[in-house]
Amino acid sequence: MRVLLIDNHDSFTYNLAHLVFRAAGVMPEVVLAEDVTPEHLNNADRIIVSPGPGRPEEYPWFPGIFRDPPAPVLGVCLGFQGMCMAFGATLERAAHPRHGEVTEGHTRYHSLAITDLPETLEATEFAADGTLMAARHRSLPISGVQYHPESVASSGGLALMREFLAPHLWVQPVSGSPEEFITCFADEENVAWLDSSDGSGWSFLCTGDTVGPIRSSSPLGQVGVITYEGEERFIEVTRAIVVSPTGAAWALGTAPWEPTFTAPPSCAPLPRTPRTFRFDHPTYLAKIRKCQDFIARGDSYELCLTNSISFDFPADPLAVYLSLRRAHPSPFAAYLRLSGTEVLSTSPERFLRLVDAHLEAKPIKGTRPRGRSPKEDKELARDLATSVKDRAENLMICDLLRNDLGRVAVPGSVQVPVLCGVESFATVHQLVSTITAELLPGKTPVDALRAAFPGGSMTGAPKERSMEILDELEEHHPRGIYSGAIGYITAEGTMDFSIVIRTIVVKDGVATYGCGGAITRLSDPEEEWQEILVKSRPILNP
């Protein structure tokens, strides 16, 4: 292993060097910061950025090494501060400066402290006085500590260094576009592309040999789907490419691999084969009226009735997905190939996210088409925002999700920062609420996921009885991937899942597209039919 130790003219750098030797049996190459060359960086398997005097702004090379890391990076004290500031954190005079003092087993030498940690970084340790002691990047192999692990008075420094130097993750910067990156995995049986095609977040392209239920993950985590009926189909990721919102990208693996890109397939339109609704117009209207009968009897408040469209699919699903992601950019777009089933999703809806024990759900209930002019567009958005029926639908699901998160939340932590806000997407306006909570200590990410699954926006309320009624009305036909969830879960417990809507599922040359809506006592059956036509417009009129 080749370890580069960047020396910021500190008096403890060679203590760090000998800690590396104790941890890995190799001495690092120690290079003064101003003498570091691209060759030094590119030849290193691990990079350590030492402590030093002053502030990170006085070291102009700091941001680049952290934003575009050629190998896993560990920042110590000044290096840690530089890592955090590279991603937008604030560095201030510490409320509790420490020089040669030991707290919680950590020797501290610092007058400054990091505050306002950005979402891209995850805090992993705080001192008892509230000072941030350690953090890591959520996607990149970058971490750091404010304290000095090399100090003779620090405990745990050797374990920290062994963990950092352990050969469990391979990283290499790559250049190109996500459309090119997906070709790396063109011949793989199991592929996932979690695609923030609207540019709002990170994208993940990955593969792995094993597909199964959620379990203790590899260092690269698991990516996959949960069907509405609860079947878990997750790839145990062994190779991946991670793309930042700025377009910077890195290949990662549980072992080294050589990314080989080819020209992506040309975009292909949706096949113009005949479309067939599982429940035709009269049948669907009759089922809506039956929903309202159940509601009138007091069995439910809201029933999320679904339908589906099927059609022959004599086209390359990936080529069609490339067209869909351009025409309908979405924060939760996704392409998956799982043992012969291909999923093409342009979902706009977050089901559940967990970051640092902070849970967030964003159910969608209420839809209007985008207008043909700016004036009409504003009128449609205003109509949605003031609709008694749509707000009632959304409120019921919001209260349902408050209940679901309450099963695993710290008492009193469930909040609704946004109730019935209008969010606009490429083809529709949506009514969206945001529910947050703090995960109860002792509860796991899987506990949270299962407490809220299936997403209330696809069931109605009360959930248990509504699902029984829907199973009867939908004639015991499995929804499958539609109405389920797509997302990832990391070994550290971060997760993010979307609701599977606006999604084509292709198997054996036949495509299905689920669609539906929430039925309440205020629903007009014909208007509900028109709403599913609006939601299905990209499929019915490609």
Residue ranges and their predicted role:
Residues 2-6, 10-76, 80-81, 87:
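Flexible gly/pro-rich beta->alpha loop and the following alpha-helix that scaffold active-site loops
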Residues 17, 59-62, 157-158, 317, ...:
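Conserved strand-to-helix beginnings and helix N-cap segments that scaffold or border functional pockets
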Residues 52, 140, 150, 308-309, ...:
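Flexible loop residues that form catalytic
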Residues 60-67, 159-161, 319, 499:
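Charged helix-capping and loop-helix junction motifs
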Residues 63-76, 81-159:
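Pocket-forming structural segment of enzyme catalytic cores
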Residues 156-169:
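Extracellular ligand-binding/catalytic regions of CAZymes and related secreted enzymes
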Residues 168-542:
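Extended alpha-helical targeting/anchoring segments
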